[in-house]
Amino acid sequence: MQSSLKPAGSGHLQLLVCFLLLYSRPGSCSDINAHDGQGQVGSEQLWTFQGLIASVFQYLQLIFHQIVPEGMFWADDIAYELMTKKVEHLSRLHPQYPCRKDMKAVSPTANAGVRSKQEEKLQLLSPQKSPTVKVNRDRCFTTKVIPKATKQEATHPTKGFFGPFPTVGLNLVAD
């Protein structure tokens, strides 16, 4: 039996629910009712814990798929800044205009740089899926990421986010 998610006074939990609501449907953070965990817009839909966690992991996986092909590595506060910019960007999106002016979906993998190492890293994040990212038409968006790694670091990383993982080869995404 699945239980519904109810933010019992936790500001962090309400922020997470707000983030997911902004990403998944129109509205704002003020549409969230803190007493029952549902939004006033589309309140017939219940957020289950498993559904919420799956949405978070899918969204983070999409971010990883956009960052890895560019040779990005997270250090210090870069991850925090990226997520902050992402939340701000999502709150400004207009539901009728989720794509660029030419009305084509934004391709998160525009560069065809060094693929072998990058594909290997992507397979660590999602071993059962291809390294290309499919962008849903009603959820297309762009992210502006400031590169912190040089070409040499991108092809031969010595330190950074992608170090040796103790769970290499295992599927890290919750079902």
Curated annotation (Swiss-Prot):
Up-regulation conditions: Up-regulated by high levels of glucose.
Q: Name one GO cellular component term.
A: Golgi apparatus
Q: Does the record bear Endoplasmic reticulum in its keywords?
A: yes
Where it sits in the cell: the answer is: Endoplasmic reticulum; Golgi apparatus; Cytoplasmic vesicle, Secretory vesicle lumen
Tissues showing expression: Pituitary, hypothalamus and pancreas. Highest levels are found in somatotrophes, mammotrophes, and gonadotrophes, and lower levels are found in corticotrophs and thyrotropes.
- Annotated keywords: Cytoplasmic vesicle, Endoplasmic reticulum, Golgi apparatus, Signal
InterPro entries associated with the record = RESP18, RESP18_dom
Q: Does the keyword Magnesium apply?
A: no
**Signal peptide start-end:** 1-29
Query: Which BP terms in the Gene Ontology apply to this protein?
Result: in utero embryonic development
State the similarity comment.
Belongs to the RESP18 family.
Q: What does this protein do?
A: May play an important regulatory role in corticotrophs.
Protein name per the record = Regulated endocrine-specific protein 18
- Identify the gene encoding this protein: Resp18
